[in-house]
């Protein structure tokens, strides 16, 4: 089996487990993204995950596992790194506008190349600190970026009224949840079942109080 076919097969298995039915065009672009990331990763060390097959599970499927919880017309992905979960979600949801935020120059260069080569007209890249991002967003995502308190203290003002903050975490820490800043409340905490991944994965949905 050719490498690209192997990656598509692994993606399809995961999508079936997540209950997602995607058109061939989106499936192909998701694999294009993994292949681009794998090429850049060898030179720029963008992610600790080296194997493209592992990237499908630990990056693509992990990102797509929260797709049903994204809402609104605009989304900011804070500390996006190599574009996670922002790029997989943007490929899945072209009707939304995505802003990918990262202060690391080499990661921002990769993001701009990914936007160009994947023809992501609904994505822009902001290279800088989350504290400096202009505007407000209907939805904010952050994947293992910082503690809940730090994220909300730095960037809570980016969340529009009525919007939702989707914090992707591994193992839940009671003390972290207890330290939620004033003005915010946890709407729900969900355990995520991500195919072919080891360890706990959780989604914490936060709204303004």
What residue spans do the PLM features occupy?
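Conserved beta-strand/loop positions that form the S-adenosyl-L-methionine
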Residues: 78-80
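S-adenosylmethionine
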Residues: 95-99, 103-209
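Residue-level recognition of conserved structural "scaffold" positions that shape functional pockets
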Residues: 52, 86-88, 177
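Class I SAM-dependent transferase core
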Residues: 1-72, 76, 106-126
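Conserved SAM-binding loop of SAM-dependent methyltransferases across substrates and taxa
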Residues: 82-95
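Residue-level preference for alpha-helix termini and adjacent loops
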Residues: 19-21, 45-48, 54, 60, ...
């Amino acid at each position: 089996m050719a490498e690209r076919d192997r990656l598509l097969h692994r993606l399809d298995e995961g999508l079936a487990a997540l209950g997602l039915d995607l058109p061939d065009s989106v499936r192909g672009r998701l694999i294009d993204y993994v292949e681009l990331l794998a090429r850049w990763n060898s030179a720029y060390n963008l992610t600790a995950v080296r194997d493209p097959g592992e990237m499908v599970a630990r990056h693509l499927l992990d990102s797509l596992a929260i797709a049903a919880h994204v809402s609104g017309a605009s989304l900011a992905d804070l500390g996006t790194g190599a574009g996670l979960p922002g790029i997989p979600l943007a490929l899945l949801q072209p009707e939304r506008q995505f802003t990918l935020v990262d202060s690391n120059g080499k990661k921002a260069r990769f993001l701009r190349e990914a936007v160009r080569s994947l023809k992501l007209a609904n994505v822009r890249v902001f290279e800088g600190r989350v504290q400096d991002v202009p505007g407000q967003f209907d939805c904010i995502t952050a994947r293992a970026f910082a503690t809940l308190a730090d994220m909300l203290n730095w960037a809570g003002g980016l969340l529009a009224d009525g919007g939702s903050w989707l914090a992707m975490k591994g193992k839940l820490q009671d003390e972290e949840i207890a330290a939620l800043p004033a003005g915010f409340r946890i709407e729900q905490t969900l355990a995520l079942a991500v195919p072919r991944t080891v360890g706990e994965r959780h989604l914490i949905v936060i709204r303004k109080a």
